[in-house]
Structures are given as structure tokens and as C-alpha cells.
């Protein structure tokens, strides 16, 4: 059975069409299904209208006092669900209900445990977003991937509000989300092995206005911090930053000795100092930051035999590849500023900051992926082509 939770707040203008289109999409699956509307005290009669539609559609309505938030609405709705597949979508028609059928088909295929509707894969997109909104969405997505690189991996749209999951993956899992991004909570805590993404185009709002504001943005940041702590990634981040500071020190000291004391040409001294720092960072991360990775995922099956020198060499080469652009930016900034008359160590410090900023803004998931994630579940991600 398929259970779809639809959180609502003042969606009376579109709720009937949403339910009708959702039913049409799910009827094509030839499986029993239910729709659960979770309403946070709408003032426009959304809950009453949804209840009046029960003779037409298999819908139940859960009324909650006050505005308690979208993510907790999903959790409360799932608690009432009878299905072995649990799904969620918005009521405002920005999530095309027809995509529900694609999510169900993806989960009924062998092996998939989570199916995410993605705006950011081939075949997906947004209908009429402004440049500012696109930038804000991409920035929030990238921030999540940087703060939770183990959790999100290669998921293209971890901020998606439309997805489906096997109920069994949530058995015994305590979902305690903050704000409105329930998918982050599910990806961090669900016991799933494989995730599949389905493309969709985020549509225009059918009616009403956006519920997103400053409070929701703050709750999103709090949620990220909580999940980072709960999954061990916050502690790993502290170790990673400490290692990075040690590498910056090695870079600056080596450059000062090589170029300032030994007279090496700057074009030779800067790359040598950066490479020495990278080597130090790799081995410190290997032994301190990501040590737990080698005792879990990396030892599943035949992986255990690779933890020796061959596995170490492979990780080192992947690390060098992941860091090459940040290292190049570091060297370019250092050389350019020094040639313009800025003192060597000041220029080198600016280079370190530039390279570090590049890695944080664009490269953290790639770097952390060198070691994988310390989890007993090996997760895979695949893409469904647009149909």
C-alpha cells in the first residue's frame, strides 16, 4: 500500500485539484493507496474542504493546533500511515502529483529503498524562478552537501520536498526534524541501502503564497547543525579543520624556509610547500579524522584486503586529484601577490585562505568521499532517466 502525506496551511484553492491529480497518478500503479492531509490550523477552510472530499478520494485529515511546521507534519502523517511505501508532496501543485507514479515505480524496482524527485538532474528543472531564487536554492543545497558530505553523498537534490521511502527503512528510527526539510532527516537516519533519483520540473504555485521566510531559514541551519552532531560529522569537521590548520602552518613555514632562507625560486618553492602540506593533511586525516571509516564500510566483503598499501595509495591519489584545483589557486594567489610587491608570508597566507575557501565552497564532498562514510550500510545512488 502507498501512503502519501500532504502537509497543508491555507491551500483551499488548490487542495481538490491536488487530491484529484494525485489519485489519478496513483491509480495507474494498480496498488491500494491513501492520502493523508496534515493541516496546521488553516484559516481558509482547507481541512474542512479536504474532509468533504473523502467520499470522492481515499483521504484522511489530521488537524494540528497552530503552525507546527512542515517536517513534523510529515512525521505525524506517517505515524497514521498504513502503507509499506511512504511518500510526501506539497499541496500547492509546485510538486506535480504525476511524479508520484514515477516514485512508486522506482521503489517497486528491485533494490531501491528511497526515491527522490530531483530538480537538479537531467530532465529536471524549475519553471520560472528568478536568478536570486535559483542562487539561494543552489547555495542551500551546496551548504547541506558541505556540512553533511557523508549523509548526502551524490544526491543531487537533498532539499527536495517530494520523495518516497520504504517504511521498513524507518522502523525503530526516531525522526525529530527541525523546520521544513524532512528529507535531510530521512537521509541521515533511515536504514537504506540504495537511493534512486527521478527528474521533475518544479512548477508554478497553483495558488496562495510561499511559507518560506527568515524563521524557516534559521531552522534549516539549526537542523543541519543537529544532524551534523547526531551523525558524527560535526566531530569529524572539528578534526578536519584542526588538520587543515596544521597544513596551513606547514605550508607557510616551508615556503618561508625554501624561498626566504634557501633562495629557492618562488615558482618552485610555492608548489613544494603546498604539496608537503597536502601530504601531511592526507596522513593526519587518514589516521585521525577518518580513522573510523577503515573499520566499517571499507572492511565490508573484499574491501578488507584493500586497506593495506594498495588501498592507501588509491586513497592518496584520489585525495590529490580532489585537491588539485584548490592547490593551484593557492599557488597562483601566492605568486601573483608576491610579484605585486606584497610580503611573502602575507601573500602565502592569502593563498592558503583562497585555496581553503575554494575547497569548502566547491569541493568538500569530493574530498571526504575519498574515505567514504563510517556506516555499516553501503549506499548507492542511481538516476532514472526522464520518461
Over which residues does each language-model region extend?
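Hydrophobic helical membrane-anchoring modules
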Residues: 1, 150-153, 175-252, 285-318, ...
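Short, well-formed alpha-helical segments that are part of the catalytic scaffolds
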Residues: 11-26
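Donor nucleotide-sugar binding loop of glycosyltransferases
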Residues: 11-14, 42, 96
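Conserved donor nucleotide-binding strand/loop of the catalytic core
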Residues: 33-36, 47-80
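A conserved acidic beta->alpha catalytic loop
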Residues: 39-48, 93
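Acceptor/aglycone-binding surface of glycosyltransferases and processive sugar-polymer synthases
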Residues: 64-80, 85, 94-180, 205-210, ...
